[in-house]
Each structure stands twice: as structure tokens, then as C-alpha cells.
Amino acid sequence: MFNSFGNIFRLTSFGESHGKGIGGVIDGFPAGIVIDEEFVQQELNRRRPGQSVITTSRKEADKVEFLSGIFEGKSTGCPIGFIVWNENQHSNDYNNLEKVYRPSHADYTYTVKYGIRDHRGGGRSSARETISRVVGGALAKLALRQLGIHITAYTSQVGPIKLEGNYTDYDLDLIETNPVRCPDPEKAKEMQDLIYKIKGEGDTIGGVLTCVIKGCPIGLGQPVYGKLHAALGNAMLSINAAKAFEYGDGFKGLKQKGSEQNDVFYNNNGRIETRTNHSGGIQGGISNGQDIFFRVAFKPVATVLMEQETVNIDGIDTTLKARGRHDPCVLPRAVPIVEAMAAMTILDYYLLDRMTQL
């Protein structure tokens, strides 16, 4: 049951990093939506490994194959099944991990919980599982387009290098013009240089992604335990390496007084809006029609190419030096994953909202 995400729109994923493939089944997708398979593939390409010198060198085509739920280019309302075959596994790179635990990975917790683990690339705990999320998110984006809802994420911080402005201060069309996926070209160059330097040291680094949802209607969210920001937080923190989530002004708002933090209402030609958006587009757990924006912090990748202390499966102290192909920073490839999780959450809550009133 915990391999599924969503309520009405529901993604169930399967597969491991070094297994035969990664796939999923989507239930609750509305019928009659035009399925642009080229767009879905483009989204996968944004997540795909081997994009640049600051990502893992693993080469995978990551071509999605739809198995059901689509007829003559449109969704039928039936379950949509899909799979992406793994083609470039180097499982021998992980032979030295069979009997030792990698620091800050899921190796130890998986072993204790299940009594068995797939040591090849982390198995089910690998970020390769997010392929299914990106496919599900791409389909959700296609449905949300028809509702005028658009979702954009970008890198806003790598280590100590960060954007000081809000998302409104940047041209978001510049995000895809650099490998870091940052809308500020100068900061993007600094971030890229830092990641490349860290990679050369055999180390890794983390940072922050910012996500903006535009066009979200008023009323999405289910009080008390189904608040929209709680659902978005759950979605984001389910992503590998995600460590923190804040929406609106978040922790920065703690420096303000209530009179400064409040978003006052006004009548904008018959439409009630707020003069500011400290709330991040959500009040009382329900969308208020303003832009929804939030940030997700990602830790440095746990696999570093230097010797570390650890223990083996018998609890004996030893050392470990990782091998294989790994990202020095997850942020560039996490951008489409954050967008995907946001898209699936918003579509799910949109469908839930249709049940509120007859």
C-alpha cells in the first residue's frame, strides 16, 4: 500500500535500480485527455542521467512504453500502465557493498526491516524509482494544462550560493538554458562551477529547489487532515534526499509581526485578491487563488568517492570507498521530479474538490 501515491488520481510504482525496469500503474486519470507522448518523453529526458558533466555518467535512454489506458491518443479512463526498461546497469560496481552498510543510505534500515536488501544501486530506495513519478507527473500536467494550471520548479540554492530574490524577480523561461536549471545566468555559472569542483574532490553537495504553481483555483484542500500544504509537503518529502519543506514565507516570516505578515484583501474589479502573498497561496489549508510557491531542501548525495568508516553486516568496524556512477548534486535532475509530485498532488486535490458539492 505504501508504493502508491494519491487518493483519486493514484500512482502505484514498481521496480528497482538494477532490476529489469521501472514502471507504474495510474488509476483515476480522467478520460478523454489527449496524451502527448512526446511531452511525456521530454519530461523523462529532463530527469535522465548523463545530461551534463555535473550529473551521473550512467547512460540510459529512459524510453517510456505505455501498456494500457490509452486509445487513439487519448486516455480511456482505464488504468494507465507503463514501463521504462533499465539498459545500462553496472551491477558489479556494487559487489563491495553486499556485506557493508553505506553511511546515510537505506542499507541498514532496509536490512533490519525486511531481513533482505538489494545492494545493487540501492534497489527500491534508489532515486531511479522517480522515473515512475515523472511519468505520472507528466500525465497530470497534461490534464492540468486544460485547467490553466502550470507548474515550474528551479534551482534556487547550491551550497552557499543562492538566489536572494523571489520567483517574481526572475525570468523563469531561462531555467532550461543551463545545466543547473537556475533562472539567474550568473548564479547558475557559480553553482555549476561549485558542483564541478565538488565532483572533482569525490564529494557531493546539496541545496534548495523552488516551485511555483500558477492558475490554481480557489478551494483545493481538505480540512483538517487533508490540508493542501500538508499534502504538498508529504509529496516533496517522499522524494529521495529531500530533507525540508516550507511554503510561502516559511521560516523567514518568523522575523515579521502579524500586521506585517497578514495578506490583506481587496476588490480587484470584482475579484477578491490579496495585496501580498506571504501565505504562499494557501490559507486554512485551502488554496486561495494566488500563486502557490514553496521550497524543498535536498541533502548532499550520500555516496561520496572517498574512504569512510562503517560496519559490516556482522557489526564489525571497517572502511568503505564507493565506486560507480553517481550525481555530485541531485538538484538539476530533481527539478522535474518536484514538478511531477506537485502536479500529481494538485490534480488529485482538484478531483477531490469536485466531490465537495453536488
From Swiss-Prot:
Pathway(s): Metabolic intermediate biosynthesis; chorismate biosynthesis; chorismate from D-erythrose 4-phosphate and phosphoenolpyruvate: step 7/7
Entry binding sites for NADP(+): 47
Keyword GTP-binding recorded: no
Gene3D superfamilies (UniProt xref): Chorismate synthase AroC
Catalytic reaction annotation: 5-O-(1-carboxyvinyl)-3-phosphoshikimate = chorismate + phosphate
Leading EC class: lyase
Binding site for FMN: 124-126, 240-241, 284, 299-303, 325
An annotated Gene Ontology molecular function: FMN binding
Protein family membership: Belongs to the chorismate synthase family.
Annotated function: This reaction introduces a second double bond into the aromatic ring system.
Name this polypeptide is given: Chorismate synthase
Organism this protein belongs to: Bacteroides fragilis (strain YCH46)
